[in-house]
Amino acid sequence: MANHKSAMKRIKQTAKRTERNKHERSTLRTFIKRVREAVATKDQEAAKAALAVAIPVIDGAATKGIIHSSNASRNVSRLTKLVNTLG
């Protein structure tokens, strides 16, 4: 356990940030999953709509530092390629 006031504050801040980041990461995964599910059902319109919603969420997570910017770019690229395979 922390002995200093500042260390205790840091522990609280870290816990709060961890919870916030968990929620953001979970939301991110949900939107990515929606795109993949739409592609799996071969519904091109739904896949494009899901991708249009997912891209800003992915970019926002990169901006907030939840994921690395390279990870965000890779996700967007792969999902876009996946949706484009539908025709």
From Swiss-Prot:
Start-end of Basic residues biased regions: 1-15
GO MF: small ribosomal subunit rRNA binding; structural constituent of ribosome
Domain of life: Bacteria
Key word Transmembrane present: no
Biased composition (Basic and acidic residues): 16-27
Record keyword Ubl conjugation present: no
Cellular component terms (Gene Ontology): cytosol; small ribosomal subunit
Keyword tags: Ribonucleoprotein, Ribosomal protein, RNA-binding, rRNA-binding
SUPFAM superfamilies found in the cross-reference section: Ribosomal protein S20
Pfam families in the cross-refs: Ribosomal_S20p
Region of interest called Disordered, as start-end residue ranges on this chain: 1-27
GO biological process terms, semicolon-separated: translation
Function: Binds directly to 16S ribosomal RNA.
HAMAP family associated with the record: Ribosomal_bS20 (MF_00500)
Family affiliation: Belongs to the bacterial ribosomal protein bS20 family.
Name under which the protein is recorded: Small ribosomal subunit protein bS20
Organism: Citrifermentans bemidjiense (strain ATCC BAA-1014 / DSM 16622 / JCM 12645 / Bem)
Gene: rpsT
